[in-house]
């Protein structure tokens, strides 16, 4: 407690001893932040011969600095690392964060790859679930090109037992095809049907489905986008012969 005396004024300023700072850890991520606080209250006592004593409290602005440890700064930009409180700030992507012209393109060869495992990998990249900035309600994903769609494989007896149904909308307009029949007629539709079932149903799902490009044969017209090989982590995606 510091006391400053003058002829008619006494100012009391409460201050805490400057310490090295108190560490607090995020309950979700477990990282540590250092918070340093400064004195925040000033009490003034003004003496007047006619009116007696008058007490006034003045609040000083508090400055809290959150510092990210040096071994954790690689995860953040310079502005985020030196910002006030990055742990309690909700981040939401802006329009400039998901521009279609800035999104990557991937290409994958469907030869002898299991249909379901291939479709789930493609759907994850189209939705952007492989990104740290994944947001369920925003189109954050990449574009995926599938070539050799006629060579996709299925396990077990699905080639003859798996059925695809479509209806023309008229009475008796139901058409049923097996996997083998549809693969011989329109092989691209098999991959499109599998991936579309793994995307959201609604306006966002329809927009995400446009990121899928399926072609019969090894060629595709997207060389200008310079597509990269689709990273596949599933070791069982290839058909075991």
Swiss-Prot record:
GO terms for cellular component: chloroplast; chloroplast envelope; chloroplast stroma; mitochondrion; ribonucleoprotein complex; ribosome; thylakoid. Residues 1-50 form a transit peptide. It holds the Pfam family Ribosomal_L13. It is found in: Plastid, Chloroplast. One of its GO terms (biological process) is translation. GO terms for molecular function: mRNA binding; structural constituent of ribosome. Keywords: Chloroplast, Plastid, Ribonucleoprotein, Ribosomal protein, Transit peptide. Part of the 50S ribosomal subunit. Belongs to the universal ribosomal protein uL13 family. NCBIfam families: rplM_bact (TIGR01066). This is Large ribosomal subunit protein uL13c. It comes from Arabidopsis thaliana. The gene is RPL13.
